[in-house]
Amino acid sequence: MDFDELLSIAKKKVSERQISREATAGTVAAALLSAEGNVYVGVCIDTPAGMGFCAEHSAIATMITAGESHIIKMVATGVDDDYACAPCGRCREFINVVHDENYKCEVLLEDGSVTTIEKLLPYRL
């Protein structure tokens, strides 16, 4: 699966919605391609006081629930974006620690180039 397909899958899940008086969801979506060839998708949940979580965390939780944790490729995108966005530092570290080989995970960046978690997180654990 190429990055255009992953980005298309993520874009289909991006849709900001109010889920409660204090929380929104769906402003960012992520699609992850596993080593087994499965795609896992998640959306962010934004709440006051930083209690929410990122789309990458959501997709990884679904992936782990399905018995997988090795990520080959990933893409994230926002509600107002026609392009990919890089994972935040917290997500980079989370991706890195859920499987020993995830530092090799390829990531689509805003400019259309591809890098790895290892390059985005040079001082990884």
Annotate each predicted stretch with a short phrase:
Residues 38-39:
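Hydrophobic "anchor" residues
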Residues 54, 58, 90-93:
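Short amphipathic alpha-helical face segments that pack within enzyme cores
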Residues 43-57:
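Compact, glycine-rich, soluble single-domain proteins
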Residues 55-75:
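Short, solvent-exposed cationic patches
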